[in-house]
C-alpha cells in the first residue's frame, strides 16, 4: 500500500480519487488526505505510529466515565471512524420527468419530406430534433419560436381515411430561418401510433404559454397539415417554378408513385374502404381533367420529371396539390343540423363534425356542446325542477378561464366575469364543467355550493359577510369530517384516472371570486373540497369524450345517487360488486352509433322545419304583394 503523498505525486491520481466511496474526509488540502484502506483495516479506530502508542478515546460500556488522556500522549490529528459506523444517507427525492423522447419515422422541413428517422426530445423550454444519422446536426427549436403546434391522430370520413399520427410545428416567420433549411415555416414529424402516450407526455411537458396547441377540425385541415408548403410567392408561370424546384432538390413529390393512391401511415389501415374511395377519386379526376389549371400543370410536371428515388413514400399523393382537389372535391363542409331549431345560442353541426363519431376518432367541441345542450333540453321537459337547479357550461368556459393575456398572466375570473351575468350560480345545486386538456376530455361537477350561502336574511344586509360568522364547521373539523352527498365539493370524473389538482384549484379560485363579486361573501378554500371519483376506465385513447358525455347523462338521471356512491365510503364498498351495472357500461359501447342516429333524426326534423318555414314565408310574401296592389299613390298638392 502506498502512502498518500506518493499517490498524490502520481500524475494519474487526484485528490478526489483518494476519497473513500462513502463520503469526503475532513480537510481541504491534499496534505490532509488519508490513504485509502481496505474494509478490514477500516475496522481499526485510528492509524498507529511506532513512536507513540495509540490512545483509545471511545467510551467503554462498563466504565461510568471517560478515561483521562496523559499530557505527553496526544491523539493523532485525524481519527478514522470505523467502517461499521459509517452510514450513507441518500434521501429519496421525487423524480420529475425532465425529458420525453418520441421516435419519429419520417420528418419534414424546408418544404419537403425527409424519409430519415430520428427522435424528438421534449423539454420544458425547447424541442430537439436528432436523426439516427449522426452526421446530421441536431435541430434546437425553442418554445419562444413556436407559433402553433398541431397534434394529428388520424382521420377517417367518407372520402379520406388515414391513420397518420404526426406533430406539425409552425414557426414564427421572423425566426424560421434560424431553425430550418429553406423557406418553409412548417415542420412535420410522423410517428408510430404505438407511441401516442409519449407524444401526449411530450406535448404536456412543453411550456404552452408562447404558442397554441390545437388539433385539426376537418379533413381539409388534416390534409393541409400533412402537406408541407413553401412560403415563397409563386410567379405566374407555375410550371417553370415547379421544374426548377424539382431539379434543385430531391423531393419525394418527384418519386415514382401510383397516380392515384390513398393517404397512408407507417402502420397499415383497413383496405376495404379504399375501393369505394378509389373509384370516387377516378371519377372526379375524369371530370376535372377537362379543366386545365395551374395545379394540374404542376401535378403533370411532377409526374413527368419523376426520377429514381424513394419509391416507398406513402405520402406523395397526400402532399401533391392535385390530390388536394380530388380527395376533397365532394367533402364540402355543409350544415346538416342547427340545434335547437330556434332561439339563441344554437349549435350548428356540419358533415365533418359527424365524422368525429366514427370509431377511433376524438370528439370535437361541437359534438360535446351539442349533446350537453340536448341533455339539458330533455331535462327541462322531463324534470323541470332539476333543470332549474342545474347549470351546464360550454366547452369554451374552462379554456377561457385558464387562458393568459398578452402579459402572460392567467385571466381567471376576469376572463369569464360576464358569463354569469344572468345566472346565479349559488342558487344552483349542480354545475357541470366539461374540460379538454391536451386533447383529453374529462368532467368536473360542482355540487351543493348553495349550502355555502348564509341562510339568515339579516346577514345579507351587511356590507361584508364572512363565512366564519355563519354556523359552519371549523377548518380543522372540515378536514377531518368525511364527505357526504350534501357536502360542497368539486368532483372530477376522468376515464383515464389522472389527477387534476390544477383544475380543482382553478375552479375553486373561480368560485371564491364569484362569491365575493356577486354575493359579497368571503369564502375559504377549505369550504370547497375536491374529490376524484372512481369511474370506469376507457380501453383506448379516443373514447374520452364518449365517457365524459356518458357520465353527464348518467348524473342527470340520478344526481343524488351518483354523488352518494362517489363520496360515501359505505356505499362505495357495497356497490363495488355492481360497479359495471351502476355505470351502465353496455351503453358506452353503442354510444357513437346512438349519437349518429340522434343527429340524423334531428337533421331530418330540422330540414322539414326549414321547408315549412320557407313555405309559410313565401305565402306571406304573396299576400303582401296582393295587398300592395290595392294601394294607390296620391299626388302631392300644395
From Swiss-Prot:
Residues 1-79, 238-314, 610-638 are annotated as: Disordered. Pfam families: Peptidase_C48. InterPro entries: Papain-like_cys_pep_sf, Peptidase_C48_C, Sentrin-specific_protease. The active site is at 440, 494, 544. One of its GO terms (biological process) is proteolysis. One of its GO terms (cellular component) is cytoplasm. Residues 1-12 have a biased composition (Basic and acidic residues). GO terms for molecular function: deSUMOylase activity; SUMO-specific endopeptidase activity. This is Ubiquitin-like-specific protease 2. The keyword Transferase does not apply. SUPFAM superfamilies: Cysteine proteinases. Residues 238-249, 267-314, 610-619 have a biased composition (Polar residues). The keyword Nucleus applies. Belongs to the peptidase C48 family. Its EC number is 3.4.22.-. Residues 620-631 have a biased composition (Acidic residues).
Amino acid at each position: 500500500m502506498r502512502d498518500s503523498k506518493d499517490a498524490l505525486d502520481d500524475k494519474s491520481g487526484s485528490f478526489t480519487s483518494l476519497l473513500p466511496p462513502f463520503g469526503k474526509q475532513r480537510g481541504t488540502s491534499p496534505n490532509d488526505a488519508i490513504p485509502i484502506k481496505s474494509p478490514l483495516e477500516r475496522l481499526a479506530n485510528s492509524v498507529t505510529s511506532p513512536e507513540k502508542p495509540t490512545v483509545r478515546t471511545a467510551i467503554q460500556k462498563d466504565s461510568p466515565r471517560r478515561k483521562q488522556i496523559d499530557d505527553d500522549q496526544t491523539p493523532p490529528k485525524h481519527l478514522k471512524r470505523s467502517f461499521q459506523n459509517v452510514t450513507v444517507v441518500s434521501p429519496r427525492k421525487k423524480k420529475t420527468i425532465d425529458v420525453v423522447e418520441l421516435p419519429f419515422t419520417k420528418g419534414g422541413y424546408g418544404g419537403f419530406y425527409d424519409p430519415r428517422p430520428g427522435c424528438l426530445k421534449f423539454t420544458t423550454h425547447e424541442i430537439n430534433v436528432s436523426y439516427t444519422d449522426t452526421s446530421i446536426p441536431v435541430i434546437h427549436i425553442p418554445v419562444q419560436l413556436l407559433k402553433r403546434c398541431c397534434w394529428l391522430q388520424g382521420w377517417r370520413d367518407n372520402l379520406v381515411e388515414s391513420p397518420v399520427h404526426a406533430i406539425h410545428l409552425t414557426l414564427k416567420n421572423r425566426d424560421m430561418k434560424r431553425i430550418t433549411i429553406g423557406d418553409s415555416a412548417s415542420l412535420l414529424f410522423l410517428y408510430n401510433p404505438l407511441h401516442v402516450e409519449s407524444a401526449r407526455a411530450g406535448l404536456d411537458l412543453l411550456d404552452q404559454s408562447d404558442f397554441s396547441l390545437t388539433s385539426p377540425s376537418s379533413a381539409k385541415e388534416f390534409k393541409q397539415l400533412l402537406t408541407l408548403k413553401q412560403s415563397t410567392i409563386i410567379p405566374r408561370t407555375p410550371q417553370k417554378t415547379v421544374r426548377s424546384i424539382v431539379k434543385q432538390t430531391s423531393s419525394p413529390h418527384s418519386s415514382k408513385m401510383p397516380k392515384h393512391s390513398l393517404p397512408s401511415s407507417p402502420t397499415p389501415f383497413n383496405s376495404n374502404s379504399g375501393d369505394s374511395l378509389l373509384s370516387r377519386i377516378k371519377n372526379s379526376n375524369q371530370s376535372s381533367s377537362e379543366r386545365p389549371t395551374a395545379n394540374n400543370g404542376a401535378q403533370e410536371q411532377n409526374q413527368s420529371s419523376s426520377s429514381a428515388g424513394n419509391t416507398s413514400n406513402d405520402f406523395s399523393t397526400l402532399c401533391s396539390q392535385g390530390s388536394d382537389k380530388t380527395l376533397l372535391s365532394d367533402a364540402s363542409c355543409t350544415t346538416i343540423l342547427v340545434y335547437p331549431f330556434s332561439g339563441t345560442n344554437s349549435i350548428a353541426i356540419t358533415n365533418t363534425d359527424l365524422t368525429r363519431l366514427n370509431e377511433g376518432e376524438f370528439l370535437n367541441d361541437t359534438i360535446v356542446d351539442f349533446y350537453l345542450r340536448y341533455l339539458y333540453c330533455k331535462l327541462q321537459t322531463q324534470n323541470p325542477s332539476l333543470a332549474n337547479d342545474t347549470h351546464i357550461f360550454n366547452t369554451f368556459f374552462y379554456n377561457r378561464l385558464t387562458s393568459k393575456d398578452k402579459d402572460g398572466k392567467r385571466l381567471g375570473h376576469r376572463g369569464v366575469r360576464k358569463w354569469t351575468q344572468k345566472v346565479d350560480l349559488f342558487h344552483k345545486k349542480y354545475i357541470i364543467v366539461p374540460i379538454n386538456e391536451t386533447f383529453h376530455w374529462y368532467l368536473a361537477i360542482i355540487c351543493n355550493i348553495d349550502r355555502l350561502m348564509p341562510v339568515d336574511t339579516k346577514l345579507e344586509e351587511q356590507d361584508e359577510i364572512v363565512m366564519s360568522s355563519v354556523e359552519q364547521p371549523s377548518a380543522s373539523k372540515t378536514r377531518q369530517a368525511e364527505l357526504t352527498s350534501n357536502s360542497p365539493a368539486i368532483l372530477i370524473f376522468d376515464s383515464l384516472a389522472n389527477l387534476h389538482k390544477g383544475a380543482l384549484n382553478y375552479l375553486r379560485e373561480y368560485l371564491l371570486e364569484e362569491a365575493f363579486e356577486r354575493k359579497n361573501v368571503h369564502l375559504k378554500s377549505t369550504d370547497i373540497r375536491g374529490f376524484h371519483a372512481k369511474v370506469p376506465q376507457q380501453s383506448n385513447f379516443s373514447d374520452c369524450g364518449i365517457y365524459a358525455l356518458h357520465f353527464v347523462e348518467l348524473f342527470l338521471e340520478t344526481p343524488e345517487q351518483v354523488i352518494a356512491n362517489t363520496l360515501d365510503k359505505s356505499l362505495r364498498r357495497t356497490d363495488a360488486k355492481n360497479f359495471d351495472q351502476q355505470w351502465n357500461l353496455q351503453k358506452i359501447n353503442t354510444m357513437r352509433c346512438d349519437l349518429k342516429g340522434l343527429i340524423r333524426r334531428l337533421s331530418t326534423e330540422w330540414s322539414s322545419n326549414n321547408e315549412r318555414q320557407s313555405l309559410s314565408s313565401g305565402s306571406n310574401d304573396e299576400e303582401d304583394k296582393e295587398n300592395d296592389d290595392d294601394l294607390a299613390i296620391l299626388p302631392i298638392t300644395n
